[in-house]
Each structure stands twice: as structure tokens, then as C-alpha cells.
Amino acid sequence: APGLRDIRAAARAMHHILFAHGLSAEAMRSLGTSNIGVVLNLTEAHPASNRPCDVKAKDRLDGIHNRWFLDAIFKGEYPQDILKKLNEFMPENFEDDMSLISESIDWLGINYYTRGIVADDPGEPWPSLKDIEGSMDKTQMGWEIYPEGLKNLLLRVSKNYTGSLPLLVTENGMACADEVQNETVYDPSRIDYIFSHLAAARAAIDEGVNLQGFFYWSLLDNFEWAFGYEKRFGIVHVDFETQKRTPKASFNEWALSLNS
């Protein structure tokens, strides 16, 4: 439930979502499906300072958000530094599930929006993390715009986990307070966001990453979970009263780039 803080429930959910992936992939393979992948929400972790306690906090963030899922799928094990804290909350005999979780896949999708900067917060329960606001420009969601993090993640995942396996950027985008004026929407910050992240992806390809696709989030303004219709990610504006669609300037720039 929203707002619930239960480490036992969290540990089991983190395992069971991976086990569900393994069961689903097994079932699809048995039906002859040959193009199976999984999408992970990854965050490049940064320490708030060079203090050892903050560096360790960064490692905890990375372990929970990134390595827990990557290690399970590609190595058949959970990162020991995180498992050491979560082991007592895990399902009985969870180790028996790891071979299924780590069955081979045909591609990996990565959702990337921003980096995470954390400091150690010893007054909080484990993982004792305090989010720190970055210095770069922010989206309407309050997320720092950090395209370098996408390149770094692609390089790291390719080097440490996937090798030549195809990668896809399955989500990347920003929310803006878009308004229609004179039958158009001018969104230069989104244009900058899109092309800076495309440049980061291109740089990763140039360094050997087998990146096969890039999907912007999203084509249309839509319902954004707890934020409802307030946060607009689309490159096409939607009037939610009339359902009228208005392509934004970013839509036109994207189309031009695809045709050039």
C-alpha cells in the first residue's frame, strides 16, 4: 500500500517479482516464444560527498535499485552486501528459485530518468539513506536532468552483465507544465532533454554498447499514477476535457530527426 514501510514485505516483493519474471519466461519459452526480455528501472547512484559513510550509502542505493535485479537475472545470485541485511526476511528456500530467475533472455530493457544522490542517514532504519537534490536543472517531477547517467548505465550494464546481448532504452522522458498557445505547444526544455539523452545513447554505442532501440516516454500525455493528469510527459498534448491532440514542438523535432 502507498506509504507502507515494511522491510519484510519489500524483500519478498523484490524476490517474487523476479520469480514471476522467471516463471513467465519459462511459460513463454514452452509455447515457442523466441524473443523474451525484461525491463528494469535503473538509477545511477552517486554519493553526496566523498565521506566513506556516504560512499557506502551510494553502494546501498545501487545494491537495492540496480544490482539486486541485475545480479539475480544475469548471475543467479543476489548481491551479498544487500542480502546480508535482507536474508532473514526472504522466503524460505528462495535460493531454489535463482536458476529459474537467471534463465537466459534475448534482450534487456532499461528505463532511465535521472540519477540518485544519497547521503548516509544513521537516524533512519536500514538502508539509512537520505536523498540529496542535485545541482542540475529539474523536470516538472523534480527529477534532475542528468543524461550522462544514461551513458554510464549502458556502459556498465553492457560490460558487467549483458555483453553482446541487445539493449533497449525502453523509457526515457520528462514532464513539463505544457500549455497550448496559438494551436501549438512550445517545449524547448523537452527538446533539449530528448536530444541530450539521445547523444548519451549514441556515445554508448560508439563505445561498443549493443543498443538496438530507444523509446521516448511518452507519445501522449497520460495518467501518471499518483500524479493523475497533472504531469505531462507526452510529445503530443492531450486536452483531457475534449481529447483533442496537439503535437508539441518536440514532436516535430523528433520527426525531423528521424527523417534526416
Predicted regions span which residues?
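Active-site region of glycoside hydrolase catalytic domains
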Residues: 1-260
